[in-house]
A protein has these predicted regions:
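Receiver (REC) domain active-site loop signature in two-component systems and cognate sites
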Residues: 58
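C-terminal output helix
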Residues: 89, 107-117
Length: 130
């Protein structure tokens, strides 16, 4: 039996987080969801994450700050950022920094699927991120 890939969702909006969790599960992924970047960083399964989907605008630590924190800590996880407030400057910067996708809410499901495929194809196996 093939092990399902673990996708992390970090989103402070409960409705969007639950909706994204249902979508990821319907696509066959195992999902861990978190209400904040701090909750995600405290997860004992951090090293098992194959992909991270994070909201850009969150209190305390934004999705962009979370991505940079992971890079600085040597824990690169293929990341897709989602936002209700898209900004071309941020989009260009994070894509140049290695983020796989920068998506506007509401998320286009087909585009998200393409970003997930790219993220999972580009990322190292979770064991390599430990």
């Amino acid at each position: 039996m093939t092990k399902k890939l673990l996708v992390a969702i970090v989103e402070d909006d409960r409705f969007f987080r639950e909706s994204m969790r249902r979508l990821m599960r319907s696509l066959g992924y195992t999902v861990e969801d978190f209400a904040s970047a701090a909750d995600f960083l405290a997860s004992p399964r951090l090293a098992d994450m194959a992909c991270l989907i994070a909201d850009v605008q969150m209190p305390a630590m934004t999705g962009i700050e979370l991505y940079r924190h992971l890079i600085d800590a040597g824990r690169a996880i293929p990341t897709i950022l989602v936002t209700g407030y898209p900004n071309d400057v941020d989009r260009v910067r994070v894509l140049n920094d290695g983020v796989v996708g920068y998506l506007r809410k509401p998320v286009d499901e087909e585009y998200l699927k393409g970003c997930l495929r790219a993220a999972l194809a580009s990322g190292a196996s979770p064991a390599e991120n430990a």
